[in-house]
């Protein structure tokens, strides 16, 4: 049945003979688009971009890196004798096929065990798979070669991304996952490194191999063309070439009369080279020849005029060798012969200049054409015929995901491995003329390198940590399920956070549908940290070879065979930035290319093809990191998506050979479009726009649903299109801090911190996108009954009044888990660690805490109630036997206490204790403590519209206002919270929620949905006998009198946020002080003081409150006594026991004064003295009161 239908889809005559009954009506569209979206998420999920990228890395990149590495070639060098050996043995090692097995853990006894992710989390292991490679060893002795193949040599471990195809959990059913203690809803897409979950954040960068023209505001250059060229999957760093046009009068000197010259900046060459000299160095000598490569049409006087100054400048140099010498002299180190300089210049032109065009011999023509194209673009921009490029256009950006990031790392680590291998093998060869392979492969290089970067987030070599990028790998946010999803779809721009540039932070038009417009952090990173929109996908990259072969067949003319004059009328073709040829029939070519892509034949669906008709260019991109999104294909103003597709998707839920998203892509119904191609498409917002008589009759695509422009966090907001935009941004940040159920297996996990809400509810008012975020299964909030009124004044300034009785029934009650961990580290035999119960007889340094809560094995037992500073894990460290380790009492202790204590500010119950062995085979404990958190005054709550507030007071139900029906609100918020913030969505949500509660079905609040509006909701509410705008008559709870106004009243979804008073309350009278300056410590965790800062000081000075000032800044901070010599004013040596003083500077022992200054001041004086600056304290003799009176008299 399906086969003939598929043929119908692919039939080009499609639109003509199928009758209109198969079209989707406007009413059915509301459902149809969600069927398509569901098909997308069923197949792709929300973290597909991470998983695909990692799979690409393992399946393709690793193999490519290993194969591309040159063989290790060695020969025995005679060490001591001066004579050379006649024919030393030659050795060569070549790497072939690689293998990655399932994640494995080797126990200390050496037995390999398959490892599950949860075991890795609990035991602080790294979830990694061993990597094996086949090595061929060729030994040549006396002209006879012997070859030996070593199968599957272990070279290191590669961390595995959860749920990728190499993970144990891939393709498991929910039942299997549950048996493994994994959450079936967990999306994967992260790594487990030493027991902690790490995400790789996508890194934004400018696209390589593309020509950009920028104008320079006020510099030496008027325009600058750059091409950052980089060979696909090679280890070479990018080499950038610039072609710049000097500003008028720029470049100084007498040449200004000549006009604007064009110069090139080549890699490894210190000075700028006139562009004509570069052409001559490439072997194009005559002026006409060069101009042909730059200006394709000689009948263009303006452009000819622009290049004239450059021709005049290079007039002196006419042959290729002179030009090469000119370039070589400006790069090579001085004092080399002319031949060497020419050779050096040739080498640079071949290998370093524009490597993506070619690095082999005889690429001169291609390179000349490409440089000519760069100059041509520069001239077009200078003449104002083509607009400048936009740095912030998302099509000019690439996102590096796990794949490219890990490939970059693996490439350098593998190179190091080869280096170490060569050195070790050379040693063995010199000693005994042969070597064993397994001794030379240092497996820890790759293992440690990958683990280090993923664990710390410093992306690059450990030794050069300061140059590497920081924060590439982050600990996965596990506060709420939403926070987890959002973290896995984040992208980061590596621009300094300090820069005040507004441009890169602004929302760019091209980000529509690719980047969420609401979800970005507030503060310094605003706009630099982005989140992907729901249906955005990032290309993993494919090989350009099939496309190049196809173009060859389809009459593309190669640059080597083209005469420059032919280029003017033809269309240039670029593949991944490299100019590969020209074509005479661009229209036909594009149609064929698109058709092939829609049939997924030769061309992969994620390849993008752009035809720039005005500039006569066709650009084809197959590289990784382009952001793209699916759109519905429109042909002849009709959707390619028909009713039958929808029916097939609907009924496919249970069949084995079901109709899926891939079939839609393969059937030419939807396609992936990146933002470059989007610019050349005409996209309808809704299928209604395709009706005839619209403002456009050449639509090429149609949006699936406009709500898909939002990201994970913004998709939870009901009616976001009725809120002021910053409010949606605030909610996107707060939704990540709401409490809920963050994963269904939280009881078997040992997370450092975890909050779980007691009775989470799914919202009464939902958006359609929520079902893909699993918000209904793992919600983070409660439908509270909310009244908006000012009642008693305890809800001013964004505070809320809560119903105490509702809290007693469990409203917003949550449980808080915190884990503590410790292990016996065996550093060396001298100080051996033991987990045991410390005793006061044997241990020094024991605190005044309760050690008796510990069991005999030194670990507290589950169910114990613990409070601040109690011991949870007893641990002792053996002290080495030295005699000077005596205590003040003169007692010698064999051990020192190293126990773990509960945080001083917390109380709770020991929930779970886990004993295990860690990766080193040492004993290892994790203890989870739980405490119940009731909502209390000062805790933070928020609705889903950025309306956050703290609890101001709790009233019993009797004191709350009530409606005529006898309903009392759970929460009362202040009316002043709404008007100035314009969160109308909040009010509509309340109205819709009221209707839903009456109607008994979930309300729809999907954005950009015109079918739901206030008029309709109000009309339906009226039918249930309520006021049409949701107002109700209420009675004062204290007096029973009717309130004079009607109150807006109904259910609203509220979230409890993680900021709780119990975690913040802090005060200090006396406490610990810092070693260095003897001032109080900082921070609540260290029982620190509250800083009386510069601004506070300035206020007290302006008050003139000197005694208070002295007390704060001196008496209660760091008072100190110093003794000062009266003669020279320097600090003297004082011995208070014998009461003897001596000034070392002037040998004075009697004239000494005691001075009280802050200890920090004393420290400053001594630091100044160490720099040979003498701060002298000049002291006056203190007058007695009597002498004072006499002097006044």
UniProtKB/Swiss-Prot annotation:
UniProt key word Transcription: yes
InterPro entries noted in UniProt: DNA-dir_RNA_pol_su2, DNA-dir_RNAP_su2_dom, DNA-dir_RNAP_su2_hyb_sf, RNA_pol_bsu_CS, RNA_pol_bsu_protrusion, RNA_pol_Rpb2_2, RNA_pol_Rpb2_2_sf, RNA_pol_Rpb2_3
Residue spans, zinc finger C4-type: 1125-1146
Pfam families referenced in this protein's UniProt entry, alphabetically: RNA_pol_Rpb2_1, RNA_pol_Rpb2_2, RNA_pol_Rpb2_3, RNA_pol_Rpb2_4, RNA_pol_Rpb2_5, RNA_pol_Rpb2_6, RNA_pol_Rpb2_7
GO cellular component: mitochondrion; RNA polymerase II, core complex
Keyword Cell cycle: no
Alphabetic keyword roster: DNA-directed RNA polymerase, Magnesium, Metal-binding, Nucleotidyltransferase, Nucleus, Transcription, Transferase, Zinc, Zinc-finger
EC number: 2.7.7.6
Catalytic activity annotation: RNA(n) + a ribonucleoside 5'-triphosphate = RNA(n+1) + diphosphate
A GO term for molecular function: DNA binding
Gene Ontology biological process terms from the UniProt entry: DNA-templated transcription
Top-level taxon of origin: Eukaryota
Role of this protein: DNA-dependent RNA polymerase catalyzes the transcription of DNA into RNA using the four ribonucleoside triphosphates as substrates. Second largest component of RNA polymerase II which synthesizes mRNA precursors and many functional non-coding RNAs. Proposed to contribute to the polymerase catalytic activity and forms the polymerase active center together with the largest subunit. Pol II is the central component of the basal RNA polymerase II transcription machinery. It is composed of mobile elements that move relative to each other.
Family note: Belongs to the RNA polymerase beta chain family.
Quaternary structure note: Component of the RNA polymerase II (Pol II) complex consisting of 12 subunits.
Note, other: The binding of ribonucleoside triphosphate to the RNA polymerase II transcribing complex probably involves a two-step mechanism. The initial binding seems to occur at the entry (E) site and involves a magnesium ion coordinated by three conserved aspartate residues of the two largest RNA Pol II subunits.
Protein name: DNA-directed RNA polymerase II subunit RPB2
The encoding gene: rpb-2
């Amino acid at each position: 049945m399906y086969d003939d239908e598929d043929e119908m889809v692919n039939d080009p005559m499609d639109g003509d003979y199928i009758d209109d009954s198969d079209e989707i009506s406007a009413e059915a569209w509301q459902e149809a688009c969600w069927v398509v979206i569901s098909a997308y998420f069923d197949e792709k999920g929300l973290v597909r971009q991470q998983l695909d990228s990692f799979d690409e890395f393992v399946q393709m990149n690793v193999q490519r890196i290993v194969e591309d590495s040159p063989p290790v070639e060695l020969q025995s060098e005679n060490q001591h004798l001066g004579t050379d050996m006649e024919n030393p043995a030659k050795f060569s090692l070549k790497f072939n096929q690689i293998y990655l097995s399932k994640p494995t853990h080797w126990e200390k006894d050496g037995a390999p065990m398959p490892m599950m992710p949860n075991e890795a989390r609990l035991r602080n292991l790294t979830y990694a798979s061993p990597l094996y490679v086949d090595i061929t060893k060729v030994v040549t002795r006396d002209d006879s070669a012997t070859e030996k193949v070593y199968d599957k040599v272990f070279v290191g471990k590669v961390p595995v991304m959860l749920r990728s195809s190499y993970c144990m959990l891939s393709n498991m059913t929910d039942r299997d996952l549950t048996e493994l203690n994994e959450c079936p809803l967990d999306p994967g897409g992260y790594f487990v490194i030493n027991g902690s979950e790490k995400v790789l954040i996508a890194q934004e960068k400018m696209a390589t191999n593309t020509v950009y023209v920028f104008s320079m505001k006020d510099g030496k250059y008027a325009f600058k063309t750059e091409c950052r060229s980089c060979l696909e999957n090679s280890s070479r760093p990018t080499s950038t070439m610039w072609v710049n046009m000097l500003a008028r009068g720029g470049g100084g000197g007498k040449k200004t009369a000549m006009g604007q010259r064009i110069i090139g900046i080549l890699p490894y060459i210190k000075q700028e080279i006139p562009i004509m000299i570069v052409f001559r160095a490439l072997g194009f000598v005559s002026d006409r020849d060069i101009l042909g490569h730059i200006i394709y049409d000689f009948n263009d006087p303006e452009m000819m005029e622009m290049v004239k100054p450059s021709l005049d400048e290079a007039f002196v140099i006419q042959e290729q060798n002179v030009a090469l010498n000119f370039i070589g002299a400006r790069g090579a180190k001085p004092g080399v012969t002319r031949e060497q300089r020419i050779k050096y210049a040739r080498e640079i032109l071949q290998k370093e200049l524009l490597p993506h065009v070619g690095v082999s011999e005889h690429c001169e023509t291609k390179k000349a054409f490409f440089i000519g194209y760069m100059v041509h673009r520069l001239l077009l921009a200078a003449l104002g015929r083509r607009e400048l490029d936009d740095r912030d256009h998302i099509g000019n950006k690439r996102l590096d995901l796990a794949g490219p990031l890990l490939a970059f790392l693996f490439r350098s680590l593998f190179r190091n491995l080869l280096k170490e291998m060569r050195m070790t093998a050379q040693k063995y060869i010199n000693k005994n003329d042969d070597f064993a392979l397994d001794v030379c492969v240092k497996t820890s290089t790759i293992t440690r390198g990958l683990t280090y970067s993923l664990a710390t987030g410093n992306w690059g070599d450990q030794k050069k940590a300061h140059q590497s990028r920081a924060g590439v790998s982050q600990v996965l946010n596990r506060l709420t399920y939403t926070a987890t999803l959002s973290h896995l779809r984040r992208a980061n721009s590596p621009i300094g956070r300090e820069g005040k540039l507004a441009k890169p932070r602004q929302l760019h038009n091209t980000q529509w549908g690719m980047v969420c417009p609401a979800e970005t952090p507030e503060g310094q990173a605003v706009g630099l940290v982005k989140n992907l929109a729901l249906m955005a996908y990032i290309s993993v990259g494919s090989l350009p070879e099939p496309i190049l072969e196809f173009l060859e067949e389809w009459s593309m003319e190669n640059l080597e065979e083209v005469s420059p004059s032919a280029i003017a009328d033809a269309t240039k073709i670029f593949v991944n930035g490299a100019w590969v040829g020209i074509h005479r029939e661009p229209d036909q070519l594009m149609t064929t290319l698109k058709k092939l892509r829609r049939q997924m034949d030769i061309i992969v669906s994620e390849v993008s093809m752009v035809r720039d008709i005005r500039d006569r260019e066709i650009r084809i991109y197959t590289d990784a990191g382009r952001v793209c999104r699916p759109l519905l294909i429109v042909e002849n103003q009709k959707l390619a998506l028909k009713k039958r597709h929808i029916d097939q998707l609907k009924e496919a839920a249970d069949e084995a050979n079901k109709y899926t998203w891939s079939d839609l892509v393969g059937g030419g119904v939807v396609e992936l479009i990146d933002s470059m191609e989007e610019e050349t498409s005409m996209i309808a917002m809704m299928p209604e726009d395709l009706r005839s008589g619209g403002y456009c009759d050449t639509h090429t695509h149609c949006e699936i649903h406009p709500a898909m422009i939002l990201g994970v966090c913004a998709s939870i907001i009901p009616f976001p299109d009725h809120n002021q935009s910053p409010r949606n941004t605030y909610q996107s940040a707060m939704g990540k801090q709401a409490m809920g159920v963050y994963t269904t297996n939280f009881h078997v996990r040992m997370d450092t911190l975890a909050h779980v809400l007691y009775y989470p509810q799914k919202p009464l008012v939902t958006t359609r996108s929520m079902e893909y975020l699993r918000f209904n299964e793992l919600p983070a909030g409660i439908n509270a009954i909310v009244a908006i009124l000012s009642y008693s004044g305890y809800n001013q300034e964004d505070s809320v009044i809560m119903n105490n009785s509702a809290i007693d029934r469990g409203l917003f009650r949550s449980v808080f888990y915190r884990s503590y961990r410790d292990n016996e580290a065996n550093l060396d035999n001298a100080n051996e660690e033991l987990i045991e119960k410390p005793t006061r007889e044997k241990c020094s340094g024991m605190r005044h805490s309760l050690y008796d809560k510990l069991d005999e094995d030194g670990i507290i037992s589950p169910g114990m109630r613990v409070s601040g500073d109690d011991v949870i894990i007893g641990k002792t460290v053996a002290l080495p036997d030295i005699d000077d380790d005596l205590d003040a009492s003169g007692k010698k202790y064999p051990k020192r206490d190293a126990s773990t204590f509960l945080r001083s500010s917390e109380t709770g119950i020991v929930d779970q204790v886990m004993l295990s062995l860690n990766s080193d085979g040492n004993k290892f404990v994790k203890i989870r403590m739980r405490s119940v958190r009731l909502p209390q005054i000062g805790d933070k709550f928020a609705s889903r519209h950025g309306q956050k507030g703290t609890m101001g007071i709790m009233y019993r139900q009797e004191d709350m206002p009530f409606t005529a029906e006898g309903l009392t609100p759970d929460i009362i918020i202040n009316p002043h919270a709404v008007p100035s913030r314009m969160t109308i969505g909040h009010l509509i949500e309340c109205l819709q929620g009221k209707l839903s509660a009456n109607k008994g079905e979930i309300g729809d609040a999907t954005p950009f949905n015109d079918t739901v509006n206030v008029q309709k909701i109000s009309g339906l509410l009226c039918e249930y006998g309520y006021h049409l705008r949701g107002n109700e008559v209420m009675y004062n709870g204290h007096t029973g009198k009717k309130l004079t106004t009607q109150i807006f009243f109904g259910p609203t979804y509220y979230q409890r946020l993680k900021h709780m008073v119990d975690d913040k309350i802090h005060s200090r009278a006396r406490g610990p002080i810092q070693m260095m300056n003897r001032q109080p410590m900082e921070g609540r965790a260290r029982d620190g003081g509250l800083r009386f800062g510069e601004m506070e000081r300035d206020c007290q000075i302006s008050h003139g409150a000197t005694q208070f000032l002295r007390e704060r800044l001196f008496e209660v901070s760091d008072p100190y006594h110093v003794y000062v010599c009266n003669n020279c004013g320097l600090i003297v040596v004082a011995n208070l026991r014998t009461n003897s003083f001596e000034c070392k500077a002037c040998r004075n022992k009697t004239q000494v004064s005691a001075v009280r200054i802050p200890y920090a001041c004393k420290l400053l004086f001594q630091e100044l003295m160490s720099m040979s600056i003498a701060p002298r304290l000049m002291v006056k003799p203190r007058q007695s009161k009597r002498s004072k009176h006499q002097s006044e008299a």
